[in-house]
Every structure is written in structure tokens, then in C-alpha cells.
Amino acid sequence: MNRLIILVFAAVFLTLASAEVSEDVNMAKRGVPCRCDSDGPHVRGNTLTGTVWVFGCPSGWHKCQKGSSTCCKQ
């Protein structure tokens, strides 16, 4: 059982390590949608135009929300 867990972790690690850096930029809407400051006030029906990125905004994106949030917009 322990060998199986180690094998699974190794497969996940190798998959992440071999991923190209540019894949994050090519997948524009991967992640959780968020509300940018330009989206207007909190009203039902407003679209969420930003995307939350865990490790900050990738190149070509900019931070679109004031504060410590990582809500980014292309």
C-alpha cells in the first residue's frame, strides 16, 4: 500500500514538473471566477470577469482588484 501511494505521488509530481510554463497563459479561464473592481457594485446578475490565480498573475494579466486578492484579468 505504501508503494502505491509513493508511486501515485511520483506520477503527480512528474506530471506537474513536465508541464510547460506557458500552459497557464494559454488556459485563460482555469481557476475560480472573481469580481474585478471594474465589474461594478455587488448586484445580482453582474458577470465575474476576473480569475483567481494562486501564485499571482501570469504574464499578460494584471491585478484587477484592490487589496491582497489575486484576482487577475487579461
From Swiss-Prot:
Pfam families listed in its UniProt record: Toxin_4
GO cellular component, one term: extracellular region
Cell compartments where the protein resides: Secreted; Nematocyst
Keywords: Cleavage on pair of basic residues, Disulfide bond, Ion channel impairing toxin, Nematocyst, Neurotoxin, Secreted, Signal, Toxin, Voltage-gated sodium channel impairing toxin
Positions in coiled-coil regions: none
Signal sequence region: 1-19
Name this protein carries in UniProt: Delta-stichotoxin-Sgt2a
Predominant place of localization: secreted
Disulfide bridge map: 34-71, 36-64, 57-72
Gene Ontology molecular-function annotations: sodium channel regulator activity; toxin activity
The keyword Acyltransferase is annotated on this UniProt entry: no
Cited function: Binds specifically to voltage-gated sodium channels (Nav), thereby delaying their inactivation during signal transduction.
InterPro entries: Myo_ane_neurotoxin_sf
Protein family: Belongs to the sea anemone sodium channel inhibitory toxin family. Type I subfamily.
Residue ranges the record assigns to the propeptide: 20-28
